[in-house]
């Protein structure tokens, strides 16, 4: 009898787990923004193609002057 179970065990292979399908996100799953503070606009004229990222420092300085830097969501690192 034990020989039967031994032979049966070598033929039974564990099936791989099916991959979980990612749920598609729709509008009902997204809430309103929290703690949103509008600081400034950056338009295409302000960040010209010739300037590259040279204007980044000026934009950062403008954003710093707009409000409190001690917010919990504030990032102290530069771009």
UniProtKB/Swiss-Prot annotation:
Q: Can you locate the S-palmitoyl cysteine lipid attachment residues?
A: 10-11
Choose one Gene Ontology CC annotation of this protein and give it: cytoskeleton
Query: Tissue range of expression?
Result: Widely expressed. Expressed at higher level in T-lymphocytes, dendritic and whole blood cells.
Region called Disordered, residue ranges:
48-79
List compositional bias (Basic and acidic residues) regions by residue number. 63-72
Q: Does the keyword Cytoplasm apply?
A: yes
Q: Which GO terms describe its molecular function?
A: GTPase inhibitor activity; small GTPase binding
Q: Which PROSITE patterns does UniProt cross-reference here? A: CRIB (PS50108)
* Domain CRIB, residue spans: 30-43
Impact of changing residue 66 to A on the protein?
Abolishes interaction with CDC42 and induces a decrease in blocking CDC42-induced JNK activation
The topology of this chain with respect to the membrane is: Lipid-anchor
Alphabetical UniProt keywords: Cell membrane, Cell shape, Cytoplasm, Cytoskeleton, Lipoprotein, Membrane, Palmitate, Phagocytosis
Is Cell membrane found in the keyword set? yes
Its localization reads: Cytoplasm, Cytoskeleton; Cell membrane
Q: Please give the function described in this protein's UniProt entry.
A: Probably involved in the organization of the actin cytoskeleton by acting downstream of CDC42, inducing actin filament assembly. Alters CDC42-induced cell shape changes. In activated T-cells, may play a role in CDC42-mediated F-actin accumulation at the immunological synapse. May play a role in early contractile events in phagocytosis in macrophages.
Subunit notes for this chain?
Interacts with CDC42 (in GTP-bound form). Interacts weakly with RAC1 and not at all with RHOA.
Q: What is known of its domains?
A: The CRIB domain mediates interaction with CDC42.
Q: Which family does it belong to?
A: Belongs to the CDC42SE/SPEC family.
Give the protein's recorded name.
CDC42 small effector protein 1
């Amino acid at each position: 009898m034990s020989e039967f179970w031994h032979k049966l065990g070598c033929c039974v292979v564990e099936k791989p787990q099916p991959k979980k399908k990612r749920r598609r996100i729709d509008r009902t799953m997204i809430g309103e923004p929290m703690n949103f503070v509008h600081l400034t606009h950056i338009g295409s004229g302000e960040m010209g193609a010739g300037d590259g990222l040279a204007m980044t420092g000026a934009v950062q300085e403008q954003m710093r002057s707009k409000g409190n830097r001690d917010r919990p969501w504030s990032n102290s690192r530069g771009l």
